[in-house]
């Protein structure tokens, strides 16, 4: 008999060879219609898996995240089968699951078009309707290579060659289709009913642009048609909010091939950038930070000393000057340690909070670049706090409170915190790890934030907090970080003289609130759908004239507003007023003042707000006072 242990710590005995599905039938009949796979000793396996030794047993159900991932994995296989039946000459490559869906890469001379996706979906539904079983088989390496070679599936042969010798080669069959796969899969194709193929794009074998180009078909799959419909509607909303589209429409920025991964900020976009930068600068100043500026180009020797050369070299932009290798900095932290080291420090100088709006450069493949969200050149709202062990708790608390104040101002109130504690391999003593971890927990608790534990995911040099924002349509964006560092100050020879007269290495807290200004602006644009708060809008007020007689009055109002630091513009064109209103609404201008004969006579303005179709008249002085009350923070 074998002992099978369950999540409630109970244990049952069974004959060796019992299938996972049989255990569910005997002990969990209420899960029969929900079970999609099982876990044996934390490894996900098919329901049909035979259990031959003592183990821990769990059921994976359709309503779990893992269950949904299996549905998507199944659907990727079904799509590959459909395409092989429709286009026999196509070679299959890989088909993993991703966030909200899946994709499959194919090698073929046939160019897939978006118009073909519906036909592929129809073929997939035929396969699903047949309720074909997913059958797992274990093959020898020789059998697998021979089979896929005979089928002309060159990429599968390449994948097999990279599988370690000691690992089994497993394949899955459904109908006439056989694919190299570790699994697990559902019992049959019938579960994958709610799906949609979403787009076609190019890709490269192993993600390397020097390799053969492939075609990638993306899809999404869900448990029910209702979930699918909700997701697809959300996709439409995401497309409407795309910061690249809005950024172009509002003339905020652009990107071009001659400077991939770098932003051309236009006048209005730079206004937003500077408002954010100056707001953060003022908050830092009020919270005891000093601001510094460090070089962009630094010698290879500094990156070797810091440890970044070994771990980060492939992401650096390198050059050679005077026969010496230099790198454009990918991060600011080693530079800040140099400033710390520039003079003798005492414990009385700590904590030292050092901030920089540091422009950094990191290599990202062209395929990974995405508007403002993923770039090669970016500016961090970076700061490093040099402190003693005894100051960690207070500094972490202050940072959490500052971060929450900033997020609320920008319209984010739903914040998820992830706490990553000590990994197995780490630097520093258990005592300092205990103190650091307790400090982070205490800071989150004091800020009235709940956290999710990310066990063992801290860096080898210290634990960390990650702060994730939830936007208006429920998407999550990781922005803020607080990272303890016990190692870099020691590597770079940073020390202070303690009250005992001895030298001590400071603790270094790496921290950021926005992450990068570029990405944060992209998030803001999508969160607000381009309709930024009045204080952040590049143009806060547009004054529109109905007749030529109103031009002088409109211009005088503009000057009056600008003297009060209102960002105002005036439209004195000959267009009809309704056209002007539509035009300025499309530019997301938060406040419109409309000026006609009546307004001139009464020294008033007719006000229309971006989110309202109503107009109301107010004296120009009162209208300006009202605008001033919300035009800055």
Curated annotation (Swiss-Prot):
Keywords: Aminoacyl-tRNA synthetase, ATP-binding, Cytoplasm, Ligase, Metal-binding, Nucleotide-binding, Protein biosynthesis, RNA-binding, tRNA-binding, Zinc. GO terms for cellular component: cytoplasm. Belongs to the class-II aminoacyl-tRNA synthetase family. It catalyses: tRNA(Thr) + L-threonine + ATP = L-threonyl-tRNA(Thr) + AMP + diphosphate + H(+). Homodimer. Binds 1 zinc ion per subunit. Zn(2+) binds at residues 333, 384, 510. It is found in: Cytoplasm. PROSITE patterns: AA_TRNA_LIGASE_II, TGS. GO terms for biological process: threonyl-tRNA aminoacylation. The gene is thrS. This is Threonine--tRNA ligase. It holds the Pfam family tRNA_SAD. It comes from Ehrlichia ruminantium (strain Welgevonden). GO terms for molecular function: ATP binding; metal ion binding; threonine-tRNA ligase activity; tRNA binding.
């Amino acid at each position: 008999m074998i002992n099978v242990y369950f999540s409630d710590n109970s244990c049952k005995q069974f004959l060796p060879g019992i299938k996972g599905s049989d255990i569910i039938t005997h002990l969990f009949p209420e899960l029969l219609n929900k079970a999609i796979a099982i876990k044996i000793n934390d490894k996900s396996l098919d329901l049909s898996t035979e259990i031959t030794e003592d183990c821990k047993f769990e059921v994976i159900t359709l309503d779990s995240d893992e269950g949904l991932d299996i549905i998507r994995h199944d659907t990727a296989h079904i799509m590959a089968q459909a395409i092989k039946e429709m286009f026999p000459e196509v070679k299959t490559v890989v088909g993993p699951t991703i966030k909200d869906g899946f994709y499959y890469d194919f090698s073929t001379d046939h160019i897939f078009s978006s118009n073909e996706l519906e036909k592929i979906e129809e073929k997939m539904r035929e396969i699903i309707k047949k309720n074909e079983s997913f059958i797992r088989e274990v093959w020898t390496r020789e059998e697998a290579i021979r089979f896929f070679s005979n089928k002309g599936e060159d990429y599968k042969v390449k994948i097999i060659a990279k599988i370690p010798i000691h690992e089994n080669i497993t394949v899955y069959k459904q109908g006439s289709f056989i694919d190299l796969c570790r699994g697990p899969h559902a019992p049959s194709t019938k579960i994958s009913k709610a799906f949609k193929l979403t787009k076609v794009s190019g890709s490269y074998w192993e993600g390397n642009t020097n390799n053969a180009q492939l075609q990638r078909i993306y899809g999404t799959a869900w448990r029910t048609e209702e979930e699918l419909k909700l997701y697809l509607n959300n996709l439409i909303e995401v497309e409407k909010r795309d910061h690249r589209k809005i950024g172009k429409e509002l003339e905020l920025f652009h990107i071009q091939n001659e400077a991939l991964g770098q932003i051309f900020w236009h006048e209005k976009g730079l206004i937003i950038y500077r408002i954010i930068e100056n707001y953060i600068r003022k908050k830092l100043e009020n919270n005891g930070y000093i601001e510094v500026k460090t070089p962009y180009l630094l010698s290879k020797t500094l990156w070797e000393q810091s440890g970044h050369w070994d771990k980060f070299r492939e992401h650096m932009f390198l050059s050679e000057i005077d026969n010496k290798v230099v790198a454009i900095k990918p991060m600011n932290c080693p530079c800040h340690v140099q400033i710390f080291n520039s003079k003798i420090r005492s414990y009385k100088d700590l904590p030292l909070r050092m901030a920089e709006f540091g422009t950094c450069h990191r290599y990202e493949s062209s395929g990974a670049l995405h508007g403002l969200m993923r770039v090669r050149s970016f500016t961090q709202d970076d700061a490093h706090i040099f402190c003693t062990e005894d100051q960690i708790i207070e500094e972490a608390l202050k940072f959490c409170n500052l971060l929450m104040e900033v997020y609320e101002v920008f319209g984010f109130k739903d914040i998820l915190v992830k706490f990553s504690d000590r990994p197995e391999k780490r630097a520093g003593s258990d005592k300092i790890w205990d103190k650091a971890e307790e400090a982070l927990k205490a800071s989150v608790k004091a800020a009235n934030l709940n956290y999710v534990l990310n066990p063992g995911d801290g860096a080898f040099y210290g634990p960390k907090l990650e702060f994730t924002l939830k936007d208006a349509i429920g998407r999550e964006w990781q922005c803020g970080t607080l990272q303890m560092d016990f190692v870099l100050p020691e590597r770079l020879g940073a020390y202070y003289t303690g009250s005992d007269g001895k030298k001590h290495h400071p603790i270094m807290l790496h921290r950021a609130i926005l992450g990068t200004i570029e990405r944060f602006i992209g998030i803001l644009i999508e969160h607000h759908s381009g309709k930024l708060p009045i204080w952040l809008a590049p143009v806060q007020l547009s004054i529109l004239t109905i007749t030529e007689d109103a031009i002088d009055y409109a211009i005088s109002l503009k000057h009056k507003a600008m003297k009060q630091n209102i960002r105002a513009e005036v439209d004195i064109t000959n267009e009809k007023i309704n056209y002007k209103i539509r035009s300025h609404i499309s530019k997301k201008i938060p406040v419109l003042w409309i000026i006609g004969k009546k307004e001139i006579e009464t020294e008033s303005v007719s006000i229309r707000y971006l989110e309202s179709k109503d107009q109301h008249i107010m004296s120009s002085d009162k209208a300006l006072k009202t605008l001033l009350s919300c035009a800055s923070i």
